[in-house]
C-alpha cells in the first residue's frame, strides 16, 4: 500500500512538473522503500530495503562510484530475506569489485518436479488445501559471492572471475497452514522413489568458481538506450564440502547471456536478452538446479526457470533441468521525465514477451520409474480425483513455454528503479490433456530494476 501511495504522488507530480534539464547528481543518494507484497501461500511480506549510490563529484553520472543495497523482510508464514550487496568501480583502480551476502529463508517454496512438461502440473494442487501443499518444499540458501572484473586493454572486452558459496538446507515445507501429520508432497514422492537421493535430500554446501569474458558497448548499465552486452563464463563446484557421500556432486556449467538494445526514437528502446545455462560435465545436485548464476546481481533472487527474475508470468521454478534456453523481449517506453525533490525522475512502461524451455533433461530415467518399481498408490487428491505416483511422469518432452505482460517503472537518477510487472503464461498444455501447465492467473512482481 505504501508503494502505491508513493506511486500516486509521483504521478501527481508529473501533471504539474515543467520540462527541466536533468541535473548531474553528486555525493551520496539514498533510495529507501518498504518491502510489501502478498502471497496466498506465504502470507504478507513486510520489511524495508535501501539503495545507496555514491556519485562523487558527478563526473561519472549517471554511472556511480559505488552502490550498496540492503533488504530485510519477512513473510507472515515464515519465509525471510536478509540481503546486503556492494558494487564498486573505484575501490581498486582498474577493477570492478562486487560482494553479496544473502540469507533466503524459504521454509515454503515451490517444487514442480523436473523437466517441465514431463512433470504433471495440476492447478488444484498448486495451493494449500486442508493442510496439504503438494507442490511445496523447503529450500533455505545462505549465499556469499565475491566477483572481480577488469578491462582487456582499451577494448570493450573484459574478464571476470569470482567465487560463490551456497549452503542449502532442503526438506519438507515448514508452513503454519500445513498439517505435519498428513501432508505429502511431490518432494516426498521424489525422495521415496530415489529421484532425489537421500544423501542430497536435505541440502549441501558448494563453492562455485566462476571465470569468463564480458563484452559491453551499452551507454548505461542500469537503464541503457543502445549497445550490446555479452557475458560468457564457466562456473563449477568440486564436491569437497559434503562429507562421505556414496557418489559425487561435482559439476561444471556454462552460462551465456546476450543483451541488445536499440533506440526507436527518443522515448522507446527495444531490448532483447537471450540466455543459455547448461551442464557441461558432472552431476549437479537437485537443489542447485534453480540457481541462475549472474555476474552483476540486479535482483536479490535470481532463481529459475520461472517467475519474475527469469521468465515472468509463470509459476516460480516451474522449469528445472540440466540445461535451459530462455529469452526476454521488451519495449521500454518513457512516459515522462521530470524533476522532483531535487532528483531526476522518469516513468516508463515495458510491454514484454518471454519464452523458455528445458533443453537437456535431469534424471529423466529415474522419473520414468514413478509408480513402477513400487506399488502405485494415490499420493494426492484434488477436484474429486485421486492422483497416483505414476501420474506425475507424463512421458512428454518439454517444449517452448511463452508468456507476456506489462510493467510500470518509476526510475530515480537512472539507477534506482521501482518495478511493477504483471505477466501471464500462454503454455496451457492443451495438447497434453490438461490446462494451466505453467500456473493460472496473473503473475506479479514488485521489486527493483529491469530484469536485464
Q: Model-predicted segments: where are they?
A:
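Short loop/turn motifs that connect adjacent beta-strands in outer-membrane beta-barrel proteins
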Residues: 20-28, 56-65, 91-97, 153-159, ...
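Outer-membrane beta-barrel initiation region
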Residues: 20-98, 180-182, 186-225, 339, ...
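Outer-membrane beta-barrel translocator/channel fold
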Residues: 59, 72-144, 272-305, 431, ...
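C-terminal outer-membrane beta-barrel translocator/porin domains of Gram-negative envelope proteins
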Residues: 222-343, 359-361, 366-368, 373-382, ...
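Outer-membrane beta-barrel "beta-signal"
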Residues: 410, 438-452
Amino acid at each position: 500500500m505504501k508503494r502505491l501511495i508513493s506511486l500516486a504522488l509521483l504521478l501527481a507530480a508529473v501533471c504539474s512538473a515543467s520540462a527541466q534539464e536533468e541535473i548531474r547528481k553528486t555525493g551520496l543518494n539514498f533510495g529507501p522503500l518498504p518491502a510489501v507484497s502478498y502471497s496466498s501461500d506465504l502470507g504478507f511480506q513486510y520489511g524495508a530495503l535501501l539503495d545507496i549510490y555514491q556519485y562523487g563529484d558527478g563526473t561519472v553520472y549517471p554511472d556511480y562510484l559505488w552502490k550498496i543495497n540492503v533488504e530485510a523482510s519477512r513473510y507472515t508464514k515464515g519465509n525471510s530475506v536478509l540481503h546486503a550487496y556492494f558494487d564498486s568501480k573505484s575501490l581498486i583502480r582498474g577493477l570492478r569489485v562486487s560482494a553479496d551476502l544473502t540469507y533466503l529463508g524459504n521454509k515454503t517454496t515451490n517444487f514442480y518436479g523436473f523437466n517441465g512438461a514431463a512433470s504433471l502440473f495440476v492447478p488444484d494442487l498448486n495451493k494449500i488445501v486442508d493442510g496439504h501443499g503438494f507442490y511445496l518444499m523447503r529450500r533455505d540458501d545462505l549465499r556469499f559471492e565475491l566477483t572481480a572484473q577488469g578491462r582487456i586493454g582499451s577494448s570493450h572486452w573484459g574478464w571476470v572471475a569470482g567465487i560463490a558459496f551456497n549452503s542449502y538446507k532442503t526438506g519438507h515445507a515448514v508452513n503454519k497452514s500445513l498439517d505435519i501429520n498428513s501432508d505429502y508432497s511431490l518432494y516426498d514422492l521424489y525422495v521415496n522413489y530415489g529421484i532425489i537421493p537421500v544423501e542430497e535430500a536435505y541440502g549441501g554446501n558448494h563453492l562455485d568458481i566462476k571465470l569468463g569474458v564480458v563484452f559491453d558497448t551499452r551507454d548505461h548499465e542500469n537503464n541503457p538506450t543502445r549497445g550490446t552486452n555479452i557475458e560468457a563464463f564457466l562456473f563449477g563446484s568440486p564436491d569437497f564440502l559434503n562429507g562421505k557421500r556414496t557418489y559425487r556432486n561435482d559439476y561444471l556449467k556454462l552460462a551465456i547471456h546476450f543483451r541488445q538494445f536499440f533506440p526507436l526514437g527518443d522515448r522507446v528502446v527495444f531490448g532483447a536478452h537471450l540466455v543459455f545455462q547448461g551442464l557441461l560435465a558432472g552431476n549437479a545436485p537437485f537443489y542447485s538446479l534453480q540457481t541462475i548464476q549472474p555476474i552483476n546481481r540486479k535482483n536479490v533472487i535470481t532463481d529459475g526457470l520461472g517467475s519474475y527474475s527469469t521468465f515472468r508470468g509463470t509459476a516460480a521454478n516451474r522449469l528445472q533441468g540440466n540445461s535451459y534456453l530462455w529469452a526476454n523481449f521488451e519495449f521500454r517506453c518513457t512516459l515522462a521525465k521530470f524533476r522532483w525533490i531535487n532528483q531526476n525522475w522518469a516513468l516508463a512502461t515495458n510491454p514484454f514477451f518471454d519464452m523458455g524451455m528445458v533443453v537437456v533433461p535431469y534424471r529423466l530415467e529415474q522419473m520414468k520409474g514413478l509408480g513402477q518399481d513400487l506399488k502405485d498408490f494415490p499420493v494426492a487428491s484434488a477436484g474429486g480425483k485421486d492422483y497416483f505416483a505414476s501420474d506425475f511422469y507424463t512421458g512428454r518432452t518439454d517444449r517452448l513455454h511463452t508468456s507476456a505482460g506489462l510493467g510500470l517503472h518509476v526510475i530515480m537518477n537512472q539507477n534506482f528503479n521501482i518495478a511493477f510487472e504483471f505477466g501471464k503464461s500462454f503454455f496451457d498444455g492443451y495438447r497434453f490433456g490438461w490446462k494451466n501447465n505453467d500456473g493460472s492467473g496473473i503473475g506479479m512482481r514488485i521489486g527493483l530494476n529491469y530484469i536485464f
